[in-house]
């Protein structure tokens, strides 16, 4: 009975993230990778702008989870564990949570790392997936509770340049990360 209750609670949380992500697709957002100075905690770039990471940040924020704060606090304590891709010597609460490699490190440390596979059944609503688009360009999205037209896999809410959209793109690029995070 305990296992059943635990599983049900987990599924509810995942479904809430899926619903939050789908809700984001109702709003017009222009892809804009600009650096913004934002408030802290609970800071966000202008609501009509964003990138792939902002989809994840905004969906979790709808659940009361502030990834800006959580990533920043973890980076303050564990800066050496995070990627050094940008040559920074200290944290930056305006941008750190908006970088895919930083979110991958955070989810690896604080969430659950799941198998990276080519099997659609390994990906369930509420999962976070990261891809390598090409040449080291990374991307992130959320698996949601909507199936593809052929009913073979769940779809993804992400922003790869056309705003916050729902697409069948799970296996379009090389998967480099697969996580769940429930705080």
Report residues per predicted region.
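Second-shell loop/turn segments in exported
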Residues: 38-47, 89-93, 114-117, 164-165
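Acidic helix-start/capping segments at beta-turn-to-alpha-helix junctions
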Residues: 33-53, 66-88
């Amino acid at each position: 009975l305990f296992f059943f209750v635990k599983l049900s609670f987990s599924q509810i949380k995942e479904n809430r993230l899926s619903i939050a992500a789908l809700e984001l697709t109702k709003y017009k957002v222009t892809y804009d990778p600009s650096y913004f100075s934002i408030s802290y905690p609970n800071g966000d770039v202008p609501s009509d702008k964003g990138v792939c990471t902002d989809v994840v940040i905004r969906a979790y924020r709808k659940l009361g989870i502030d990834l800006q704060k959580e990533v920043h606090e973890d980076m303050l304590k564990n800066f050496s564990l995070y990627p050094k891709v940008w040559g920074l010597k200290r944290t930056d609460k305006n941008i750190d949570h908006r970088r895919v490699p930083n979110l991958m490190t955070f989810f690896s440390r604080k969430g659950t790392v799941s198998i990276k596979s080519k099997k659609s059944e390994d990906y369930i609503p509420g999962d976070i997936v990261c891809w390598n688009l090409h040449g080291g360009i990374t991307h992130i999205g959320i698996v949601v509770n909507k199936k593809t037209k052929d009913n073979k896999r769940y779809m993804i809410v992400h922003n790869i340049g056309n705003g916050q959209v729902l697409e069948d793109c799970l296996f379009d690029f090389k998967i480099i990360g697969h996580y769940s995070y429930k705080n």
